[in-house]
Design a protein with these regions (language model features):
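Short amphipathic alpha-helix
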Residues: 17-28, 187
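A short, glycine/small-residue-rich beta-strand->loop->alpha-helix junction that serves as a flexible
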Residues: 7-22, 178-182
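Active-site proximal beta-strand in glycosyltransferases
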Residues: 86-115, 132
Length: 189
């Protein structure tokens, strides 16, 4: 079975990026991958997926990756990710050196002035198969900063469960002591 690693240093911060990554993880798992998270708390992932109503069947942890976020050793990250067929990495603007067969970086924010054009960054990008972003605006900034052609994948939207329509007359307005500001007194007469 193919193995995928989801790397997001922010699973303890509930936000749009976490939902995006967990939804992506669900899609990756449904494609037949054995799913691993670079995290140290399986219960936290379970709580998030339950809260966000995201279905993950069999989540595993790879705790060896988490300390590498801040270690600053590109070679250590490369070696640790080599055993995976796919790595999906939520970036903070930096580009890690990833070793999987297929490497995808998600940029949630339009990072600029972070040295995306530097030689070392461009060298690490040679190992990245695709950069994905969540909007055309983010794409325009990321493409210019990192000299790349990112792919826009919009965040998933949970369908609204509709109820039976209720017949209702709704009036929206405000109460003000001075009714003649907009000549409303004429409407009353």
């Amino acid at each position: 079975m193919k193995r995928a690693l989801i790397v997001t240093p922010y699973l303890d911060h509930l936000g749009g990026g976490e939902r995006y990554m967990l939804e992506a993880a669900s899609v990756i798992e449904s494609a037949g991958y054995e799913l691993h998270f670079a995290w140290d708390n399986l219960e936290q992932i379970s709580k998030l997926t339950n809260l966000l109503d995201i279905k993950l069947k069999n989540t595993q942890l790879d705790t060896s990756i988490m300390p590498l976020y801040s270690q600053g050793s590109p070679l250590a990250m490369f070696k640790a990710t080599r055993e995976y067929d796919l790595v999906l990495y939520l970036s903070d603007g930096s580009i890690p050196l990833l070793g999987a067969k297929a490497n995808i970086i998600h940029m949630q924010v339009p990072f600029h002035n972070v040295g995306g054009g530097k030689f070392a960054t461009q060298l690490k990008l040679k190992r990245v198969n695709r950069i994905i972003v969540n909007s055309n605006f983010t794409k325009s900034v990321i493409d210019q900063e990192y000299r790349t052609n990112s792919l826009v994948i919009y965040p998933p939207v949970t369908p609204i469960k509709t109820r039976a329509k209720e017949k209702l007359i709704l009036s929206v307005g405000r109460f003000e002591p001075t009714v003649n500001i907009k000549k409303q007194d004429i409407l009353i007469q």
